[in-house]
Each structure stands twice: as structure tokens, then as C-alpha cells.
Amino acid sequence: MARSKNTKLLANFDCPGGGQVWVVGNTLYVGHMRQPTGTSIVDVSDPRNPKLAAKVEVPEGWHSHKVRVAGDVMIVNHEKQGPDGDASFGGGLGIYDVSKPAQPRLITKWRTHGRGVHRYDFDGRYAYISPTAEGYVGNICMILDLKDPAKPEEV
């Protein structure tokens, strides 16, 4: 394992089962492996004192372990874990306005069939996703146009 001689621990931030971390300026967006926390938004403007700014929760049986932010738009995956989980929540993507990171606002939820979205990338316009889809076995590749985040369109 590599070791750095010029680093030292300034602080830690205890959060439940972190998945992916996305950094924008002084804000960390953390996707979680287990409910109820889907996504944590952490203010690290004072690196010695990181603070939870907001969190987005998901119901039992679901997780949002991936997160991406471009501009003022945050997208998180909604993926079913195991056989349990409220089917009405549904798999897909949660699309949020994070122009005020401490107050994330759901713009819309794009739904998919089955277990939901597992991995994806987002370039600010297009989301390249791997959802489960009706008529297919397993995850497939799909592209969503988020020119208007309130109305995602499959390309």
C-alpha cells in the first residue's frame, strides 16, 4: 500500500455505509449503501469541522449508493436491495436541484422497470445509465437527455 509522508488527518465524518463520494468545491455528496440515508450532503468549507448540510432518505429495501453533480443538478440512483422494499418507491433516478446544497429539492424521479439503476455517469446534459428494463435480462445501457431536468428523455 502506498503511503504519503506529507498528509495528516484533520478530521473525520462518521456516516452510514458510504458508497460513492462526489466533490464540488467545499461540498461532498455521499451515496449510501443502506437506508434510511440515501445521500448525505456534507459541508467541508472548514476541513477540520465537516458538517452534515442535508440528507436525502430512501425507504427500507432501497439504496442510492451512487451520486453525481453537474452545475446545480444532482442525480442519485434508486436501486432495490434484495426481495423486500416498497414497490411504490420504484427504481430509477432521483433528479435534484442543489443550487442550495443544504436544501436539495427533488425536481423529478425518472422511473425504470425492475430493480432500478445501478451504475451511471452524468456530464451535465446526458446521463449514461445501466438500468433494468422491461423485456431485457439484467442491466442494459441507456442514455437520458437531461437538457430539461424536469423532463428526462430517453435518447
Residues covered by each model-derived region:
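Feature marking well-ordered beta-strand scaffolds used for ligand recognition
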Residues: 1-155
